[in-house]
Structures are given as structure tokens and as C-alpha cells.
Design a protein with these regions (language model features):
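Subset of outer-membrane beta-barrel
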Residues: 29-323
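Cleavable N-terminal export/targeting peptides
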Residues: 1-32, 309-323
Length: 323
């Protein structure tokens, strides 16, 4: 089998999986304020230092539903650039500045709680060599979140005032041609002090801490095949003393415009994900098996994502670097 036939076969398999996953979308769910698949498709949501780390403007949409719970997230990021003059007959070229910007609009309904929010992210990228192939970046996200409780579900005795509260995230991120690592914290202000009149229900927000590290291994240059082993550690204030129980190893494989992978969790869960890039458009699917249950006795998590990469038209070889 030649390389072209192999790539066509992979594309057909991905489209088949995508069709099945979309039909299951109505059974999906997301973690409030932190979509389950964001660490795969839009990692800058949990680490603002990643904003602008790619050389194109990207917009992503995540959506999932399950019963009375649902969540939607629209996010985007870009690196600020300026137009510079080319050489001789060459056209003008874009030169990237050190500043990245991004933002998101999100809504999630989980049980009796409903959150609607907006965020703005800023990052500063410091080049670590003259070739500008490795950077150390610092980022911050400022958020405004509007929270309310469904009084029809909690009853009139638990009268709850609708609350608009601020929050922010911080992050630091190193990335080069092969190795990357980052550390971030979200919802730093924690849970707002307001609650219902009987002090029973509180706004479901907690500080979250993320650490990620990974390495890209080139397996085949002619076929643009890259293997990326990595790990993600995610804890909050209540689990920060159990870091060893929250290490999630991740394996990801890139084959030209297609990527897929899997992640393993210490609590027995396992997830699969895949992404395919069309010119300027990318689609992806995320599927997580339930925790230690046999044959879907609990609903699995299924998410679908759609995005736009609004980068200048480049050669095919160059575009394969846009992951």
C-alpha cells in the first residue's frame, strides 16, 4: 500500500467515525466552564499563555447535550502580526509580534445551575533564540460570569439572587519545534461568597490547576507522520494533594491533515479523539467511555467540534505544520 492509498483509507475511516459520533451528540455532556474536549481541540481555554502560539487565526465551536444539561463554547485566538516588505519581486510578508489575543463566549446548564460568560485573553511570547523557533509565553484571561439557579427546581425556600461575578486565569507556556510544557490555573478567585437564603446551594466554581508536557517525534517526513506522547495533570483545591491520581497520559498521531489519539485516566476512563483539517476548516470528534462500567450502562461522553483556520494561503508542505 502506497502512502496516498493509506491516507485515503484513514480519511474514510475518520469520516465514518464522525458520522456515527454526530448521530450520538444528543447524549453527550461537558464539565461546566471547562469542556471535556478543550484540552484536545482548544487548549488555550485552560492555559491563556497558549493564546497566539500558532501562526494563524483560529475559531472553534464545542457543543454537547445530555438531558437537562448542555454546554456550548465559542472561542478563538490569534497572534498579532504586521505586514513587512518582501524582497525584490516577492510579495509582502507577515511578521508576527510578541502579543497574542483570544476570547471565548460560553454557556453551560448543569442541574439547577446556569452559567453564561465571556472571557478575553492576552499573552506575551518571548523568543528564546534568534531563529524564533522556541518561545516562553505568559498569559492571562479575564472573565465575567453570570450565574443563576432554577428556582422552580430548588423551591421558593432557597431564593437565590442572580449573580454577576469576575474571575481570571493565569498561565505560562514553553514551546519549541519538538518539546512543549505549560502550567496554568483557572478560576483563581474561586467560589463567589453569594449563595441561596438557606446557605445550602453555592455557585459551582472552583480553582483548577493544569500541568501539561509533551514531545513531538517525527516518524516519517515524506508522509508527514508525527507521534506526540504527552501528559496532562488536572487538579482542583480538593484534589491537589492527590496529584498522582490525576495524571492522564495521552498518545496522539498526526498523519498530514489527520490526527487521532487516546487518553487514559487513573479512575479507569478512556477517551478517543480525532480531527481532520480541510482547507481553512477543521472538524473533530471526542468520545469518552464511562468510568468502569460495562457496555455503556452509563451514557458515554460524545462531543463534536468545528473550527476555522484563517491563515494566509501557503504551500501544502507548510500547511502540514499548522497543528
Amino acid at each position: 500500500m502506497n502512502s496516498r492509498s493509506f491516507i485515503i483509507m484513514v480519511e474514510r475511516i475518520f469520516l465514518s467515525v464522525l458520522f456515527v459520533s454526530v448521530s450520538c451528540l444528543a447524549k453527550g455532556q461537558q464539565t461546566p466552564l471547562s469542556p471535556v474536549s478543550s484540552w484536545v481541540f482548544t487548549p488555550y481555554v485552560y492555559n491563556p499563555a497558549m493564546v497566539g502560539s500558532k501562526d494563524f487565526f483560529s475559531i472553534g465551536l464545542n457543543a454537547a447535550f445530555q438531558g437537562n444539561s448542555n454546554a456550548q463554547l465559542i472561542s478563538g485566538d490569534t497572534r498579532i502580526s504586521k505586514t513587512g516588505s518582501g524582497y525584490f519581486s516577492s510579495p509582502e510578508v507577515s511578521e508576527f509580534k510578541n502579543i497574542g489575543i483570544g476570547g471565548s463566549v460560553f454557556k453551560d446548564i448543569s442541574g439547577i445551575s446556569k452559567n453564561i460568560g465571556i472571557s478575553a485573553s492576552f499573552s506575551y511570547h518571548v523568543p528564546l533564540n534568534v531563529s524564533h523557533l522556541s518561545f516562553l509565553s505568559f498569559g492571562i484571561s479575564v472573565k465575567g460570569i453570570y450565574n443563576s439557579l432554577d428556582n422552580d427546581l430548588v423551591g421558593p425556600a432557597h431564593s437565590f439572587k442572580k449573580t454577576l461575578y469576575p474571575d481570571f486565569d493565569l498561565g505560562v507556556y514553553y514551546y519549541g519545534t519538538s518539546f512543549f510544557t505549560g502550567l496554568s490555573s483557572t478560576n483563581i478567585l474561586g467560589n463567589p461568597w453569594k449563595s441561596d437564603t438557606l446557605k445550602i446551594f453555592k455557585i459551582p466554581v472552583s480553582r483548577q490547576y493544569f500541568f501539561t508536557a509533551g514531545y513531538k517525534i517525527l516518524l516519517s517526513k515524506p508522509m508527514n507522520i508525527v507521534l506526540e506522547p504527552s501528559a496532562l495533570i488536572f487538579v482542583n483545591d480538593s484534589t491537589i494533594r492527590k496529584i498522582s491520581d490525576n495524571i492522564n497520559p495521552i498518545i496522539k498521531l498526526y498523519i498530514e491533515d489527520f490526527s487521532f489519539g487516546t487518553s487514559f485516566y487513573s479512575d479507569g476512563k478512556i477517551s478517543f479523539f480525532a480531527q481532520y483539517r480541510y482547507p481553512r476548516i477543521w472538524v473533530g470528534v471526542f468520545y469518552e467511555l464511562p468510568e468502569k462500567t460495562a457496555y455503556f450502562s452509563k451514557s458515554p461522553i460524545v462531543e463534536f467540534t468545528l473550527g476555522l483556520n484563517l491563515q494566509p494561503v501557503k504551500s501544502k508542505i507548510s500547511n502540514h505544520g499548522h497543528w
